[in-house]
Regions:
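Short, compositionally biased leader-like segments
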Residues: 1-24
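Short Lys/Arg-rich cationic patches that frequently serve as NLS/NoLS or arginine-rich RNA/DNA-binding motifs
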Residues: 1-8, 122-130
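Residue-level detector of alpha-helix boundaries and kinks
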Residues: 6, 30-31, 96
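Intrinsic disorder/low-complexity segments enriched in polar/charged and small flexible residues
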Residues: 22-24, 61, 92
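Short acidic, Pro/Gly- and aromatic-enriched capping/linker segments at domain boundaries
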Residues: 23-39
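Short, conserved beta-strand/beta-arch hydrophobic-aromatic motifs that form part
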Residues: 35-86
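Short, structured beta-strand-loop surface elements
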Residues: 67-128
Length: 130
């Protein structure tokens, strides 16, 4: 017997490939996992912290939500980070980086520890047009 595709059973099995990274943040009382432009984004204290993308490069890794003034110090501490080629205000850790897993864990720990270089205030949502 064939099963219908896309049912509750199929949805239940879909796990984001970067879920293991944000799991370290889930026990924080302020943690919220949202969606933005086809990505998953972790909020702490209402701030955008880390964005998880699983599409084609350059949208296949982690974007660190930060201000441009913080780029140099974050790139020095987390060597594979670089400005995102499209969204240059944020830093990017490509999943293809040799140290992706190690750096991803360190970034999540820094976000959880409230590293002041990580996190931006979300922009206001535009109201829907009538």
């Amino acid at each position: 017997m064939k099963r219908a595709r896309g049912g509750a059973e199929a949805r239940a099995k879909l796990v984001h490939p970067h879920a293991w990274i944000w799991e370290a943040l889930e026990d924080d009382a302020t943690f919220v996992l949202g969606s933005m432009f086809g990505t998953r984004i972790a909020y702490l204290d209402g701030l955008l912290m880390l964005c998880f993308a699983t599409k084609e490069e350059p949208w296949h890794g982690i974007l660190v939500c930060t201000e441009r003034g913080q780029h140099a110090s974050l790139m020095a501490q987390f060597a594979p980070l670089a400005p995102h080629p499209v969204l240059g205000k944020w830093l990017y850790l490509s999943e293809s980086a040799d140290a992706f897993e190690k750096v991803a864990v360190r970034l999540a720990a820094a976000a959880k520890a409230r590293d002041p270089r990580i996190g931006v205030i979300p922009g206001k949502r535009r109201s829907e047009r009538p």
